[in-house]
Amino acid sequence: MTSALALASVTAVLKDLLENGLARGGVTSKIGGDTSVSALPPDRITAGTDEKAQLNLFLYSVTANTRVRSDRVTPGSAVPLALDLHYLLTAYGAQDFQTEILLGHALQLMHETPVLERERIRRTIDNLSHTKDRRVVAPALAALAKSDLADRVERLEIIPEFLGGEEMSKLWSALQAKYRPSATYKVSAVVIDGAVQA
């Protein structure tokens, strides 16, 4: 059974993928400073003179996945909630070319990881419950450590979604944030088991 923590768990796994990939890729030395990865709404990211080199992963939409839902329904069983998660991946930088370098590395990482494998999910979720640098783990991270996402049967596919200029402009206008170089992805399909009988 997959819990309601599935959405946050997928975001945490993607964030971990990006953080580790940037570290392995030596991006810090390429841009001349530290980088970070966040999972915040774009309007909460510092822009302007205080802007820092970072990637942001934002879950901007959740849609129904009717294919998986209909495949899993059997008479008398619980009706699953099958979802596709849509992410906006954005690069920020304070100096020339930082955004392009960060976004290029992120696009490569996502391309090289078309499927979230069970072991990666399990390892990431397990690590969420541990303290980092002797700091107390936030309650949200501690809750995610109890997620059963890794025990699921469905594979989680990372699929690029290529929005046109007009669609991207509408998305950024709706977010009420300053436009930054971005890419969009769909993670399919996340299933939350339901209690409602078919």
Per-range role (PLM):
Residues M1-R69, A142-R152, E157-I159, L163-G164:
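Small/polar-rich, solvent-exposed N-terminal microdomains that initiate assembly or binding
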Residues V10, L14, A23, S61-R69, ...:
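Long, contiguous binding/interaction regions
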Residues N20, G104-V115:
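Short, intrinsically disordered, mixed-charge
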Residues A53-Y92:
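Active-site-adjacent structural patch at catalytic or cofactor/ligand-binding sites
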Residues S70-G76, T99-L107, I121-I125:
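"Short basic amphipathic alpha-helical interaction patches in structured regions
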Residues T74-P80, Q95-F97, A174-K178:
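Short, solvent-exposed beta-strand/turn "edge" segments of beta-rich domains on protein surfaces
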Residues V79-A94, G104-H105, P181-A189:
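Oligomerization/assembly interface segments of phage tail-like spikes and tubes
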Residues I101, E112-V187, I192:
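Acidic-leaning, charged glycine-interspersed low-complexity segments
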